[in-house]
């Protein structure tokens, strides 16, 4: 059996599964030991840096879309995930006074855009898989 097939079939899913399983105790540990209130340092840099990264991913997604690149599937999905992370932290770190605004902007802006981008990524990924599968069948048929 080809080593690439072994890695694809067994190793990659095992690594992701193991990481997910080992992360569970870590999350429980954090729930027990982290304070409910913490004064963050470099707050501005963290938020500005994250949003700059989000702009880069949005721009890359747009450029890859204009280029009709197969990499659009990955960029669109990743950008959608970043938008969901942005909403989560906007809401969780907002003061009680600002929380309604964070929820409204998340529900009306970030979440719909994230779902659209992730849907685009999934659709393109499925189509690429279908085309690759068809090409494999065509090659096998020609042999």
Predicted features and spans:
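Hydrophobic alpha-helical membrane segments
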Residues: 51, 73-91, 110-116
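Membrane-water interface at the C-terminal end of transmembrane alpha helices
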Residues: 111-136
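Core segments of alpha-helical transmembrane spans in multipass integral membrane proteins
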Residues: 21, 45-63, 78-85
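Cytosolic juxtamembrane helix and N-cap/initiation of the first transmembrane helix
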Residues: 1-20
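Juxtamembrane "helix-exit" motif on the non-cytosolic side of transmembrane helices
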Residues: 28-37, 88-97
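Short juxtamembrane and helix-loop transition motifs at transmembrane-helix boundaries
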Residues: 6-12, 33-43
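Juxtamembrane helix-break-helix junctions at the cytosolic face
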Residues: 59-73
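Non-cytosolic membrane-interface motifs at loop->transmembrane helix junctions
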Residues: 39-48, 97-109
């Amino acid at each position: 059996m080809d080593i690439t097939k072994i890695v694809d079939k067994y190793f990659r899913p095992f690594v992701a599964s193991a990481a997910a399983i080992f992360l569970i105790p870590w999350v429980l540990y954090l729930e027990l030991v982290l304070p409910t209130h913490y004064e963050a340092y470099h707050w501005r840099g963290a938020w500005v840096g994250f949003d700059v990264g989000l702009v880069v991913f949005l721009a890359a997604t747009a450029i890859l879309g204009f280029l009709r690149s197969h990499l659009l599937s990955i960029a669109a999905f990743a950008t959608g995930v970043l938008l969901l992370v942005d909403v989560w932290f906007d809401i969780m770190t907002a003061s009680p006074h600002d929380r309604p605004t964070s929820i409204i902007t998340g529900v009306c802006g970030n979440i719909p855009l994230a779902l659209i981008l992730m849907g685009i990524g999934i659709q393109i990924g499925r189509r690429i898989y279908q085309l690759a599968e068809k090409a494999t069948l065509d090659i096998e048929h020609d042999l």
